Structures are given as structure tokens and as C-alpha cells.
Design a protein with these regions (language model features):
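Specific aromatic-rich, kink-prone transmembrane helix
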Residues: 96, 120, 132-149, 179-187
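Membrane-interface transmembrane helices that cradle and orient dolichyl/undecaprenyl
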Residues: 140-155, 271-277
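Short hydrophobic alpha-helices at membrane interfaces in multi-pass membrane enzymes
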Residues: 146-163, 203-207, 283-290
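Transmembrane-helix signature of polytopic, membrane-embedded enzymes
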Residues: 10-13, 97-119
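Juxtamembrane membrane-water interface segments that cap and precede transmembrane helices
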Residues: 60-72, 227-265
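Transmembrane-helix motifs of polytopic, lipid-linked glycan transferases
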Residues: 84-104
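C-terminal luminal/periplasmic domains and tails of membrane-associated envelope-modifying transferases
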Residues: 357-394, 404-408, 415-578
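Membrane-interface alpha helices of multi-pass inner-membrane proteins
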Residues: 16, 117-121, 142, 155-170, ...
Length: 578
């Protein structure tokens, strides 16, 4: 039985590693690649927004070491190497969490069962520097749990790890609340005489904490990190005092039941397990899980750490509950429940793994090409389209990676200038004055996505450009559109390359279809499909898209409901595909 338990847990870890080692599809990867290349080629640290039209704006490149590692990996194996790096970081995170659970005395079946919540963090499984924070968070937990049980000097390893972390990602500030949870928890337990930690080991923990805080000095951006630490309470899109530059970062929003119900379910499960396993309850565990829950409620991006805490901390509570129940069974029946529990844990793990597996598969490395303006960038470069460039927010990184220094992008995912961000948002949203912003920055070429990546809605800017006689569409593919100012190119060139406006809807439709194939919850993409299909009198496909839109939209849409009532008698049953 023990061999089977270990085999199943090893297989579960391998599945996590395989699903994590998949295609690169995150937009931020490319400004990080470009930053890494620039720093290696110039042997300098980035301090201003070099790659955008706000080139003089200060830039806090907190992940500078990650950028260099990312670019170095790319030079070795291209985008395939980046996929492998992503898998190694996430696989390493899971392994460190399991090791922490084992140090705490967890059984193999309990570890397998509580590995399932690891899948709930998959919203953060992108090739970003936050993966280093995932890994180092898990390693910190492992070392702290080892110190709680063994004492010694091993806890001083947190100091070099902190120096590494502080240069890889700004998430290093999380080291402070992690250590605070253990210091408060173990300090309280010592006062109550319920701690296994000696007074000397507790003093060592304080010394290690002091060294970790000293680690904030070992970075080119010490001042910026300290400011980040003391302004953490202002983080979060929509929060009072939060920077406008967080507006489009969905994971910077406060967590709600509507956008992440599993987080709330996980908190309930955690409370129940800790109550049932009260014999193993410790003040440090309460401080840690309570703190992680508060962090998760504050920001959606922090929910992952609560799920990680479940993997490392909760297995012993499952064991405590199981031991209580098993003690009431006769000896000859005890092996059967353990075997059933192991198989049940495996089934639960598979249940949580399936959505990610169906989306990403196993070990599919490389680049999700349709997600990026690959051919559009080549078109801009090959035809030397006139500067300056405007781009939609999430494509700034890729365009900087491929077009700098010939072109500076308008903005990218690391835009730290609130003024520039405001300008970019006004244009992208088609707000009044959008054209004056383009004139202010001398924009002659626009490279735009068709649909937003979060909901799938088409960009309002496209409607403005379609109606404006000063702009012409000159390139379109499955997700990219390129427009130029008519008066900025020659008439002969424009006559050869101008495309009809109908191609805009072609691109909106094709990208919306791709978006729902990878994530069907993008409800606005279903609406875009329905809208274009209805305009083209493709009514069966339109009805199918309308049905999916109405099923997923968070608010009632009377217009869509009316269209559905009109089309249903004409078509009958909805078409089986959009």
C-alpha cells in the first residue's frame, strides 16, 4: 500500500510538471525578454521607461534578474526553453510544498488529497517573475517548518534566499508577513508553553528575520522596494489610492465570490479541517493561514498563496481527523479505509486537474502564435511604416521585443507613468479626444488586437478607426490589425495595401473564436461571435453563440435575449458550434 501511495503522489506531481510545461501565452513575457536583452547588451540596469514613448519616465524593473535569466534561457532554446523554465518553477513549488507537508509529519494519502488545491492557483501559471515568488514562498515555508521541528542554523539560509528573491520579483515583500506569522505564532505558543521550539531556536528565528530584512538592501532598487513594502495597503485596482496603472490587471482586483468562488470554498474547507483536526492545531498555523486568507481577500493575485498554504499545512489536520476515526475501527478493517481514501484522493486530484489538462495538455512547449502580433510586427518592420506607433496595452511588450530600437511602443504591461497610461486608455477605449492624443504623440501607425483577453470584447477604438477617413486598414490576420494615417504614406503604396473595412469584423470573429476555444468563460467573445454572425445572416451559428453568451454573462442583457427569442423559432435547436 505504501508503494502505491508514493507512486500515485509521484504521478500527481509529474502531471503538474507536465501541464505547467506548456506554451508561452503571457504578454508580459516579452517586455521581460526585451529588458533582459537590453541589460545584457548594454551591461546596465534599467531605470527609465526606455522602450515606450514615455522614455524619460522612471521605471522600477524589480524583476531585473528574472529578465536576464529569461533572456539567457531564450538564447539556449527559444520559446521551448521558456516553457521548460515555467514548468520547473511550478514543479519546484509543488515539490517544496509537499516536502514541507512531509516535514510536518503528513501521510502520503493526505498529501495527495491536499495537492488538489494546487490546481486552483493555475490562473497565475504564466511565464512571469511571480513564479519565482511561488517557488521561494514554498521554500521559505519548508525551511521554517524544518526549524520549528529541528532548530539549528539551517534557518539562516533564508538570508541568501532573500537576496535572490529581492532581485527576482517584488513579491519578495511577502517574506515579511510569512516570518511575522511564525514569530507571532511561536512566540505565543512559547508563552503558553505549547511550542516544540526552544527559546534558543526562537531567538535564532528572530536573528534570521533580521537578516532577511537586511536583504532589502541588496538590490539596485532598495528605495523602491521599501516604498512598495510600506504602500502595500494601497495595492489593488479600484482601491482608494491605488495607481491607475493597475486598471487592466485583473489579478490586482479584490477577490469576490463572483470572480473566485473556489477561494471562499477553500477557506471554509480549511476552517473545517483545522477544527476537526484540533489535536494538531498550532498558533503558528492559525496565524499563517489566517494571514494568507486576508491577503487573498485583499487581492485576487494573492489567492494562490492560500492554496499553497493548504498543500503544506493542512495534510496533518486530515491525518489527525483520520486517526480519530480509524481508532474506532477494528484492526482488520483499517487497511481498507486507507486504501479507499488513497484512491479517493487520487480521484479528487484528477477532477481538479482535468480542466487545466484539457486546456494546455502535457509538455506542449513553444509559443501560442495567434496570441501575439507576429506577422503584424513583420509587416510594420518590412514596410517601414511611419512612426510613431500606438499599440493596444498587452501587445506593447511583444512589439518592443521585435521592433525596438527602430520603434518605441506607446505603452506596455509595465507602464509606470500614470499620465501615459491615461492617454493610452483614452485611445484604446475610443473616448472623446482619442484622436488628439494620437496627434500629441505624432502617431502615424496603429497596431491593435481585435478583442480584449479578459472578456473577449472588441476594442472600441476599432469602431472609431472604421468611421474615421484619416485612417486606413492595411493589414489584418486572425488577431491583429494595422492602421496607418493616409497622409503619412504614399498614395500608390496605400492603393496596393489598403484593405476593406469588412476585414475588421473578420479579425474580431476569428480572435473571438480562438478566445472561447481556450477559455469558454469569456462571455463577451460569445457576444462578438453572435454579433458578426447575425450581421452575416449566419443564424444557426449566431444562435449558438447567443445561447453561450446568455449562459455566461454576469448581468442580464435584454437586447441579446430579444435576439435569441427572434432567432430560436427561425433556426430551431442551436447549431453545435459557433
Amino acid at each position: 500500500m505504501l508503494r502505491l501511495e508514493k507512486l500515485l503522489l509521484s504521478a500527481a506531481w509529474l502531471v503538474i510538471f507536465g501541464v505547467a510545461t506548456t506554451v508561452i501565452h503571457d504578454f508580459d513575457t516579452f517586455w521581460q525578454l526585451q529588458s533582459g536583452r537590453y541589460m545584457i547588451e548594454t551591461q546596465s540596469i534599467i531605470r527609465t521607461d526606455l522602450f515606450t514613448l514615455a522614455a524619460d519616465a522612471p521605471r522600477f524593473e524589480h524583476c531585473w534578474l528574472h529578465d536576464i535569466i529569461l533572456y539567457f534561457s531564450y538564447t539556449i532554446g527559444g520559446y521551448h526553453a521558456l516553457s521548460v523554465l515555467k514548468g520547473l518553477l511550478l514543479g519546484g513549488t509543488a515539490l517544496a510544498l509537499l516536502a514541507a507537508a512531509r516535514v510536518r509529519g503528513a501521510s502520503w494519502p493526505a498529501m495527495l488529497l491536499l495537492l488538489a488545491p494546487f490546481w486552483l492557483s493555475r490562473g497565475g501559471w504564466t511565464a512571469r517573475p511571480q513564479l519565482w515568488t511561488f517557488l521561494l514562498f514554498a521554500v521559505f515555508l519548508l525551511l521554517l517548518e524544518r526549524h520549528r521541528r529541528r532548530g539549528g542554523r539551517e534557518v539562516y539560509l533564508l538570508f541568501p534566499l532573500m537576496i535572490l528573491w529581492i532581485n527576482l520579483h517584488a513579491g519578495a515583500v511577502l517574506a515579511v508577513p510569512i516570518l511575522a506569522a511564525y514569530l507571532v505564532g511561536e512566540g505565543g505558543a512559547l508563552a503558553l508553553r505549547t511550542s516544540n521550539l526552544s527559546a534558543h531556536a526562537y531567538k535564532t528565528l528572530w536573528l534570521a528575520t533580521g537578516l532577511v530584512l537586511l536583504g532589502f538592501l541588496f538590490t539596485p532598487y532598495t528605495r523602491e522596494f521599501i516604498e512598495t513594502l510600506f504602500s502595500a495597503h494601497k495595492l489593488g485596482a479600484g482601491q482608494e489610492g491605488a495607481p491607475i496603472t493597475q486598471m487592466f490587471n485583473m489579478d490586482w482586483r479584490p477577490t469576490s465570490f463572483a470572480n473566485d468562488p473556489y477561494f471562499y470554498y477553500a477557506m471554509v474547507v480549511t476552517g473545517v479541517l483545522m477544527a476537526l483536526g484540533w489535536r494538531r492545531l498550532s498558533l503558528a498555523d492559525l496565524c499563517l493561514m489566517g494571514g494568507l486568507a486576508l491577503m487573498g481577500l485583499k487581492l485576487s493575485r494573492h489567492t494562490s498563496f492560500f492554496f499553497f498554504g493548504m498543500v503544506a499545512i493542512l495534510p496533518v489536520y486530515v491525518d489527525a481527523t483520520a486517526d480519530f476515526l480509524m481508532a474506532r475501527l477494528k484492526n482488520r478493517f483499517r487497511r481498507i479505509p486507507r486504501g479507499l481514501a488513497t484512491l479517493g484522493a487520487a480521484a479528487i486530484f484528477v477532477y481538479f486537474a482535468l480542466p487545466a489538462y484539457e486546456t494546455y495538455g502535457l509538455f506542449r512547449t513553444g509559443l501560442r502564435t495567434w496570441h501575439f502580433p507576429i506577422e503584424a510586427a513583420e509587416f510594420v518592420r518590412d514596410h517601414r511604416l511611419p512612426r510613431n506607433l500606438y499599440n493596444t496595452y498587452d501587445w506593447g511588450g511583444y512589439l518592443a521585443w521585435t521592433l525596438y530600437p527602430e520603434y518605441q511602443v506607446f505603452w506596455d504591461g509595465r507602464q509606470d507613468s500614470p499620465e501615459m497610461f491615461n492617454y493610452g486608455w483614452r485611445v484604446m477605449s475610443g473616448h472623446p479626444g482619442w484622436e488628439s492624443v494620437l496627434d500629441k504623440f505624432g502617431v502615424k501607425t496603429i497596431v491593435s488586437k481585435a478583442c480584449t483577453v479578459d472578456s473577449g470584447q472588441h476594442y472600441p477604438l476599432l469602431d472609431k478607426l472604421r468611421e474615421n477617413p484619416r485612417w486606413a486598414l492595411v493589414f489584418a490576420d486572425e488577431s491583429s490589425l494595422v492602421f496607418v494615417r493616409r497622409d503619412a504614406v504614399g498614395e500608390a503604396w496605400l492603393a496596393r495595401h489598403r484593405l476593406p473595412d469588412e476585414r475588421i469584423d473578420d479579425t474580431i470573429l476569428s480572435e473571438a473564436l480562438l478566445l472561447v476555444q481556450t477559455e469558454s468563460r469569456r462571455y463577451k467573445a460569445w457576444w462578438e461571435i453572435a454579433r458578426v454572425r447575425m450581421a452575416r445572416r449566419q443564424y444557426p451559428e449566431a444562435l449558438y453563440a447567443l445561447e453561450n453568451y446568455l449562459m455566461r454573462t454576469p448581468t442580464r442583457d435584454p437586447l441579446a435575449e430579444n435576439y435569441y427569442r427572434i432567432l430560436l423559432p427561425l433556426v430551431g435547436e442551436p447549431h453545435s458550434s459557433p
